[in-house]
Amino acid sequence: MNWYEKLSEYFPIEEMKSKAHMEALLKERSDIYHKDEGKHHILMFAEFDSFIFVDYLYVSKDARGQGLGGKLIAKLKKKNKPILLEVEPVDEDDTDTEKRLRFYQREHFKHAQSIGYRRRSLATNEVNKMEILYWSPKTESEEEILEAMKQTYENIHTYKDEKWYGESYEKTDEVLEIIDEEKQKNIFDQLS
């Protein structure tokens, strides 16, 4: 099974980019978009001047629980930049959602509670609510995290989207926003 098939098998369709989109990022945006692949893992990430965005982190079933994911995150942390990623809310029908969240909690990621993130999947046409997690070597404001996510959305997620999907994703300001304080909830509180 190739790297794309492994990612497609593990991640929900609404979170997956097309293979052509990812290959174009690797080829045409090799200055920022990278693939770290080994026998038991795939790490897709974008490294910008001031932050890193983890697009996909996959560890094979037989290697989970052996510290490989932590080693991959530690390698990124050594770059001494904030690390951002997206996670889906806990789904009781999918135990992996809670396991992923626990992993990032162990790795000292914080939830950007003030950032609302909803984007329509061009594969399913459904709107998906995602949460933003981040780790930083210094104190970052959630406004700075929001600006980094906007940069990611515009340079990675929507890169040549019409070419790959036949239509465009929504505009950045329709997808990412600061939400009212009374609506903010810490996703880590969902863990049992």
UniProtKB/Swiss-Prot annotation:
Superkingdom, taxonomy of origin: Bacteria
InterPro entries, per the entry: Acyl_CoA_acyltransferase (IPR016181), GNAT_dom (IPR000182)
Transferase keyword on record: yes
Induction: By different stresses, such as ethanol, salt, and phosphate starvation, in a partially sigma-B dependent manner. Transcribed under partial control of SigM ECF sigma factor.
Enzyme class: transferase
Observed effect of gene inactivation: Cells lacking this gene display decreased survival rates during salt stress conditions.
EC number assigned by the record: 2.3.1.-
This protein's GO CC annotations: cytoplasm
Locations listed in the record: Cytoplasm
Gene Ontology terms, MF aspect: acyltransferase activity, transferring groups other than amino-acyl groups
Keywords attached to this entry: Acyltransferase, Cytoplasm, Transferase
Gene3D superfamilies found in the cross-reference section: 3.40.630.30
Start and end residues of each N-acetyltransferase domain: 1-139
Protein name, as recorded: Putative acetyltransferase YjbC
Organism: Bacillus subtilis (strain 168)
Lineage: Bacteria, Bacillati, Bacillota, Bacilli, Bacillales
Gene, per the UniProt record: yjbC
